[in-house]
C-alpha cells in the first residue's frame, strides 16, 4: 500500500476516534462561529498519538501511548503539544512525562545500561584528557617528527575528534531525536565521519608496521601524503554515500540507531569491518615474524613468549582489533548480555587512553625528548641564577660604621 494513502487512512481513523471520544465526553460542540477562522487540524504524529482540532494558542494534552518500540507506558500520564497562532501544530511534542512500565528483567537491564553509560562517560573523559596531553606532546616535540610518530599523531587526533562528537551526540534529547532536526543529522554525519577516519588511521598504522616488519621495506621510501590521503580523504566519499542513502531511504531519528532490516549503515560499516579484518591479518603476520626473530635469539623460551604476548597486547588497541569482539551480539542469555554491555563500554571508551599511554607516554623517543627538554630547561635556569646574583648589590651581614673606618685608618 502507498505510504501517503496509508497515512491518510490512519488520520481518518484518528479523526473518527476523536469525534466519538469527544461526543461521549459531552464535548461534541461545534467551534464558536465568532471565534478565529484558523484551527489546527486533526493530525497523527510520528509516535501514533492523535491530536484533535484545536484553537490557536491552545496547549493540548493527550494520554501517553500505551506501547512504543515494544515497551508499555503509563497511560495515566499525558503528552503535550501546542497549537500555534497561525493554525499549525508545533513540530515538537512533549513526551517527557511519559514513563515506561518495566518488569523486573527490564528494570535490571535498565540499571545495567545506566551504569554502562556512566562507564562510557568516565572512559571518554579520561581518554580525552590523555589524548589532548599526547597531542600537545607530539605538537611541541618537533625533534621526534618521523613518519611513524606523525601517524601516531593523526590517529590520536581522530580519537579526540571522535570523542568530542560522541559528547555532542549525548546532548541530543529524545524529542530532537524523534523530530529528525537538520543540525542533529549533521552531528550524526560528523560523528560517523570521525569514526571512519579513526578506523582508517588504525589501518594506516597496520600498513606501516606490516611494511616495516614483515615486508622489510625501507620506511624512508614511504610517502606521508599517501597515508594522509588514506586516513582523511577516503572516508569522505564513504560518508557522503551513506548520508545520501539515509536521506532517501531512512530519513528518520537523526540518522542514528540501527533497526532490523536497515542496510544503509553498512555503507560505512562495511569498509570499517574490511580494514579491521586486514589489520587482523597484519597483526598475525607481525606476531609471526616477531616470534621467528625471538626464537633466533639466545633468550629463554618463557621470556620469548612473554615478549610476544606483550607486543600483541600493545598492538590490539592500536590496530582496533578489540572492535572485532563486538561484531556479534552474544544472544539472549542474561549473563552474556550484561558482560557484553560492560566489556563493550569499557574497551570502546578507554581505547583512546590506552593508545595515548602505549604510543606516547611510554614511547621511548617521547620520553627521551622530554628528558632532554627538562635538562635544557634546568641548565638554562641554573645559568640565569648566578647571573642574577652577580648583577645584584652585595650586602654584608655586619654594618661597618664610619667611626670604625676612621679608627682603622688612624692605626
Curated annotation (Swiss-Prot):
<feature type="topological domain" description="Cytoplasmic">
    <location>
        <begin position="215"/>
        <end position="221"/>
    </location>
</feature>
<dbReference type="InterPro" id="IPR017981">
    <property type="entry name" value="GPCR_2-like_7TM"/>
</dbReference>
<feature type="disulfide bond">
    <location>
        <begin position="14"/>
        <end position="50"/>
    </location>
</feature>
<feature type="disulfide bond">
    <location>
        <begin position="64"/>
        <end position="98"/>
    </location>
</feature>
<feature type="disulfide bond">
    <location>
        <begin position="184"/>
        <end position="254"/>
    </location>
</feature>
<dbReference type="GO" id="GO:0015056">
    <property type="term" value="F:corticotrophin-releasing factor receptor activity"/>
</dbReference>
<feature type="transmembrane region" description="Helical; Name=3">
    <location>
        <begin position="186"/>
        <end position="214"/>
    </location>
</feature>
<feature type="glycosylation site" description="N-linked (GlcNAc...) asparagine">
    <location>
        <position position="74"/>
    </location>
</feature>
<feature type="glycosylation site" description="N-linked (GlcNAc...) asparagine">
    <location>
        <position position="86"/>
    </location>
</feature>
<keyword id="KW-1133">Transmembrane helix</keyword>
<keyword id="KW-1015">Disulfide bond</keyword>
<dbReference type="InterPro" id="IPR017983">
    <property type="entry name" value="GPCR_2_secretin-like_CS"/>
</dbReference>
<feature type="topological domain" description="Extracellular">
    <location>
        <begin position="250"/>
        <end position="265"/>
    </location>
</feature>
<feature type="topological domain" description="Cytoplasmic">
    <location>
        <begin position="292"/>
        <end position="302"/>
    </location>
</feature>
<feature type="transmembrane region" description="Helical; Name=1">
    <location>
        <begin position="109"/>
        <end position="139"/>
    </location>
</feature>
<keyword id="KW-0807">Transducer</keyword>
<keyword id="KW-0472">Membrane</keyword>
<keyword id="KW-0732">Signal</keyword>
<feature type="topological domain" description="Cytoplasmic">
    <location>
        <begin position="365"/>
        <end position="411"/>
    </location>
</feature>
<dbReference type="GO" id="GO:0007186">
    <property type="term" value="P:G protein-coupled receptor signaling pathway"/>
</dbReference>
<comment type="similarity">
    <text>Belongs to the G-protein coupled receptor 2 family.</text>
</comment>
<feature type="glycosylation site" description="N-linked (GlcNAc...) asparagine">
    <location>
        <position position="41"/>
    </location>
</feature>
<feature type="disulfide bond">
    <location>
        <begin position="40"/>
        <end position="83"/>
    </location>
</feature>
<keyword id="KW-1003">Cell membrane</keyword>
<comment type="function">
    <text>G-protein coupled receptor for CRH (corticotropin-releasing factor), UCN (urocortin), UCN2 and UCN3. Has high affinity for UCN. Ligand binding causes a conformation change that triggers signaling via guanine nucleotide-binding proteins (G proteins) and down-stream effectors, such as adenylate cyclase. Promotes the activation of adenylate cyclase, leading to increased intracellular cAMP levels.</text>
</comment>
<feature type="topological domain" description="Cytoplasmic">
    <location>
        <begin position="140"/>
        <end position="146"/>
    </location>
</feature>
<dbReference type="GO" id="GO:0007166">
    <property type="term" value="P:cell surface receptor signaling pathway"/>
</dbReference>
<dbReference type="InterPro" id="IPR003053">
    <property type="entry name" value="GPCR_2_CRF2_rcpt"/>
</dbReference>
<feature type="transmembrane region" description="Helical; Name=5">
    <location>
        <begin position="266"/>
        <end position="291"/>
    </location>
</feature>
<feature type="transmembrane region" description="Helical; Name=6">
    <location>
        <begin position="303"/>
        <end position="327"/>
    </location>
</feature>
<keyword id="KW-0812">Transmembrane</keyword>
<feature type="glycosylation site" description="N-linked (GlcNAc...) asparagine">
    <location>
        <position position="94"/>
    </location>
</feature>
<dbReference type="InterPro" id="IPR003051">
    <property type="entry name" value="GPCR_2_CRF_rcpt"/>
</dbReference>
<feature type="signal peptide" description="Not cleaved">
    <location>
        <begin position="1"/>
        <end position="19"/>
    </location>
</feature>
<dbReference type="InterPro" id="IPR050332">
    <property type="entry name" value="GPCR_2"/>
</dbReference>
<feature type="topological domain" description="Extracellular">
    <location>
        <begin position="1"/>
        <end position="108"/>
    </location>
</feature>
<dbReference type="GO" id="GO:0009986">
    <property type="term" value="C:cell surface"/>
</dbReference>
<keyword id="KW-0325">Glycoprotein</keyword>
<dbReference type="InterPro" id="IPR036445">
    <property type="entry name" value="GPCR_2_extracell_dom_sf"/>
</dbReference>
<feature type="transmembrane region" description="Helical; Name=2">
    <location>
        <begin position="147"/>
        <end position="171"/>
    </location>
</feature>
<dbReference type="InterPro" id="IPR001879">
    <property type="entry name" value="GPCR_2_extracellular_dom"/>
</dbReference>
<dbReference type="GO" id="GO:0106071">
    <property type="term" value="P:positive regulation of adenylate cyclase-activating G protein-coupled receptor signaling pathway"/>
</dbReference>
